[in-house]
Amino acid sequence: MSSSEEADLLRLEEVFSTTLARTISLILQPLLLADPEPSDPCGKECLRLLQQLHESAQRLWYVTEQSLLSLRQRLYHPPSKGLEAVLLLSNADHVLQAHMEYIKSYTDCVVAQAFQKVSKKRSEFWRSQRKALRQLLSSGSSEGSVGTTMCQALRQPLSQHVQKYLLLLLSLRDTLDESHPAQELVMHAITLFGNLQSFMGQALDQAVATQALWHSLSSRLRDVLCSPAHRLLQDSQDIPVVVTPLRAERVLLFDDSLVLLQGHNTHTFDLKLVWVKPGQDKCVLHILTPEEEISFCTRDPQGQVVWQWKVTQAVCQALCGKKDFPVLGSGRETSVPPECRCVAYTFCREGRLCQATYDGEWCRAKPHGKGTLKWPDGRNHVGTFYQGLEHGFGICLVPQASEDKFDCYKCHWREGRMCEYGICEYGTDEVYKGYFQAGLRHGFGILESAPQAPQPFRYTGHWERGQRSGYGIEEDRDRGERYIGMWQADQRHGPGVVVTQAGVCYQGTFQGDKMAGPGILLCEDDSLYEGTFTRDLTLLGKGKVTFPNGFTLDGSFSSGTDKGLYTQGVLDTAALPPDPSSTRKRQLGLGTFPVESRWQGVYSPFRDFLRLGCPGEQQEALLGFHTQSSRELRKSQECLCCERSHPEDCVGSMEDTLKELLQHRKPKALQQYLRKALSNSRHPLGQLLRTLMLTFQATYSGIGANKHLQEMAQEEVKQHARELWAAYRGLLKVALQHQGQTLEEENMETRDLQVHGLLLPLILPSFYSELFTLYLLLHEREDGLYSRGITNLSLFPDTKLLEFLDVQKHLWPLKDLKLTSNQRYSLVRDKCFLTATECLQKIITTVHPREKLEVLEKTYGEIEATVSRVLGCKYKLPMDDLLPLLIYVVSRARIQHLGAEIHLIRDMMDPVHTGGLHDFLLTALESCYEHIQKEDMRPHHLPGHWDARDLW
């Protein structure tokens, strides 16, 4: 059954609905018609505010009608409609929102004095309506102007209505049992409308105070500050403060900004970017803003408390966008604004950030966290900031003078400058991938021009303070040459080796980008010059030429006017031919560039990573990252994105990596782990290996594929294996430290065993292509002789070849030969020792020397097995029997470039095999290789009693 309170609510809503309708028709509609098409800005603003008030009044009337309808249904049909169906209870937030919108629109008009300004345009009409306006007021009378009466008529009915709402709801609550279904709804409505009553009184007071403020300001200040949305919260004329260092005459705290007045000038601070910090003195309050730090000094601590409380609450209100203040001293819990915020701001003060707009996270008035910084000239920086400076990963876009050209920096930053690893794509189409320090290239890095550049180049090496310095490789594609050596101040300086596309290479000392003093020049025809010469390889000054045939020319050289070469010296034609190892196989760079110090710029960041304890958030900064080139995207600001692993992912993955590493310490498990790690581009070891591969390719591939660099390359691969093992040990040490354990010391013998036996086989495939090419070039002559010998021996049928090689007949595997009816043993070809031959052919399918030696051992086993089967008993081959049989198998296997294979095995094999079976078999294979090259393997050296027809 409905109560008397519900009936009172119904009557209250009926009265308020009628009052609202009369207010709309008597006041708001005539106000809109007073000047429907104003021409001045002030008139247009007043019309906009009145239209907004009219719309909010109509919405409030509509909500009141809905509430009235729900009350009628409740009173006239109580069994079917419970109390909880009443709109005022079931949807109290909706009702509250309509009231809030009306209050906002009304106070905007009060602040802008819209009623007074518009009413003056139809003053006669409004004077005639004074009596009707007074009837809307509860007292029935009103003193003051028409504008004042109008304000009261629009405000008083609402204030009284909300007050009566609250009283009736309180009375209704008392009539309900605690278990009543609507009890909770009633309590919620009481809370909402209690807050509304407080808010309304505060909002009206603020609007009146703000309206009064405009009269106390000069016209210039009023034009700057006057806004319908402004609400004055505190004035220093009420509670005086002394401001330093700006020396403001007056301080105004609005709901969205803090304003300092200095004569006709204003300093306005957005409250979203204001931080409040109490001073040590109880009368001092510090205000932090993006570009100013100011202090308020009050006369007494009470004044400081008021200012601190009001500024703090104003900041909270600005951040949450709600004008909902508790009354000072009401006992409500004071809100505390967050230290970290996300706001946009444009810097004004002269300096690096002048006119730049920062949009992102802040902390204590400084950009801090993720954000975007944009300048009017088109510069952009997207990334992380720390205490106001770029810090961490960021992408910076810098426009060039030419249209649609940008420099794009994808780098790590520290204290506002590029630091550690980054990728920079310049408007010139050059790309730099490497390390920085203090905004300059520093450490290891690769700078490469666009392929279509007029003078294409690529530099791979070390930098110091933005200049090439230390060991580095530069490829000049226009000249077709590659420089391998030392640099200083962006110039070739110190020892260096130059390799040309034509196959010529020379070594000397450079100073100021030019050769200084004598050098060594090796030509493609294996002639050697020792002396002074120019960069274009013109012999100049004293020197000595050693020709391939052994002749020497010692004297002085100069160039003639007709581009000829003039010399004055001694030609010695009686000299013996030089040792091939002194000219054709002469190696450059050995001892000149100690292998331990060549790529310190690659190893150093990894060591720093280990020294810091392998922090995941520092992995890509120290070890690098890879992104797709955005050369096309750089033409627009769309390139402010980067395809790289998320830094948060690196933190977790690094911890997992260290844990996994501890689980794979046994030999077999360790081998599997290292194979997986080295093939993973995100694993620290995999990242290091990929960088080392880049340096190796930059040095020895393409133009650098020169036989005179073979030893330099093979010692570099071994050094990389040693460094990678040290890197693994470093990771293991950190992983153990995380577990509170220590890593046992490792002696040199154990280290060498692990490097050659474990790690070198795993990394050699990464360098094999370039390394084996150097072996091919170095042993090209011997392999040519060997190839001709193989061709000659292939003319023999099997039995003739066995006979020619002096293989004892009782060892011939004739039982393995299956002849057709018209075949003879003497005609069979490529059938004897077939399993051994097929086994040896697999040597070219393997990479590591250990695997190649295992193939050789299996081949030896197949030869012995075949002989044992022929003899019908187990038979161990003596060297006298083995060599002819091995020559036979080698000739039938027809392995190309066997010399390169043998020397690679010899140079890269594990020292543990020295003196063992593998060493013995490799020596035997070398003997076969050398024997096949001999003159007696040529057709004209075959036994005279052999007719060529007999070979078939």
UniProtKB/Swiss-Prot annotation:
Keyword tags: Cytoplasm, GTPase activation, Repeat
Disulfide-bonded cysteine pairs: these are: none
The record's listing under Pfam families reads: MORN, PH_alsin, VPS9
- VPS9 domain segment(s): 795-941
Repeat positions for MORN: 358-380, 381-403, 409-431, 432-454, 459-481, 483-505, 506-528, 529-552
Repeat as a keyword of this entry, yes or no, is yes
What the entry lists under SUPFAM superfamilies is as follows: DBL homology domain (DH-domain), Histone H3 K4-specific methyltransferase SET7/9 N-terminal domain, VPS9 domain
**One biological process term in Gene Ontology:** protein localization
Q: Name one GO molecular function term.
A: GTPase activator activity
Matching entries from Gene3D superfamilies are given as:
Dbl homology (DH) domain (1.20.900.10), Histone H3 K4-specific methyltransferase SET7/9 N-terminal domain (2.20.110.10), VPS9 domain (1.20.1050.80)
Q: What is its main location?
A: cytoplasm
Would I find Cytoplasm among this entry's keywords? yes
Which tissues show it?
Expressed in heart, lung, liver and kidney.
Cellular location(s): Cytoplasm
User: What GO cellular component term, any one, is given?
Assistant: cytoplasmic vesicle
Q: How does it assemble?
A: Homodimer. Forms a heteromeric complex with ALS2. Interacts with ALS2 and RAB5A.
Question: Which PANTHER family does this UniProt record tie to the protein?
Answer: ALS2 C-TERMINAL-LIKE PROTEIN, ALSIN HOMOLOG
What is the name of the protein in this document? ALS2 C-terminal-like protein
Protein species of origin: Mus musculus
Q: Identify the coding gene.
A: Als2cl
